[in-house]
């Protein structure tokens, strides 16, 4: 099953920016298109690098914020965004060709711990992008006989609805996570994703405030203000295939996992991709005819 034949992926990508761009250009492209990876290309469209949402959040509120925004620009976020070249954030991404098969895509994602791969032609020109969300969507409506609690992430970092945007970005950067459930007591009040953060910061009115020097007005914003609502949750004994179907239906990458209605963890597209194949008794099959992935427990 070649990448070019898959009923998933984005061809061409929603956002591609020149490798000579500023960090501000990538923030706007990523935030307003609500994507987590932006390929960088030269004037011929040849892949020259990639910037991830984690890189940007680290620049806005993590280690790079301290090393660059505060140390070099005296805390002026807008000036740092406008004057720092994207070369500072880029990484050299693994990629796949249009002729690559799905198994190669999955193995590369799992082996390198990455969530998206640029798809290139024989001349290394970017023609598309395939993400872990695209891949696991092929598992939708498949009964796996594996419960969500068997693959979920139990050690979840929770924040309060009134914690600030800056605190959220700091935690995302330091803990290398993309989602923060907001909990008051034991009640789930919302969830903030890395896409929510970048979508908010890239808004014209928010950038205008940063340009004016009103960083605190932006960075002190309560997380609940930018959070995704309502929060979708599943009980921990639900089949993984049903959880994937819910993610696909609502266009999201994670579900809060509950037990008797109380939050107990989170299951993400990354959990499905990397942990499901490791569950004892589970086999993964690729159906070339229907271009579908079948995964499930075949021995108990």
Swiss-Prot record:
SUPFAM superfamilies: CBS-domain pair. PROSITE patterns: CBS. The keyword Repeat applies. Residues 10-68, 88-148, 152-207, 226-284 form the CBS domain. Keywords: CBS domain, Repeat. The keyword Repeat applies. PANTHER family: CBS DOMAIN-CONTAINING PROTEIN, CBS DOMAIN-CONTAINING PROTEIN CBSX3, MITOCHONDRIAL. This is Uncharacterized 33.4 kDa protein in ribosomal RNA operon. It comes from Thermofilum pendens.
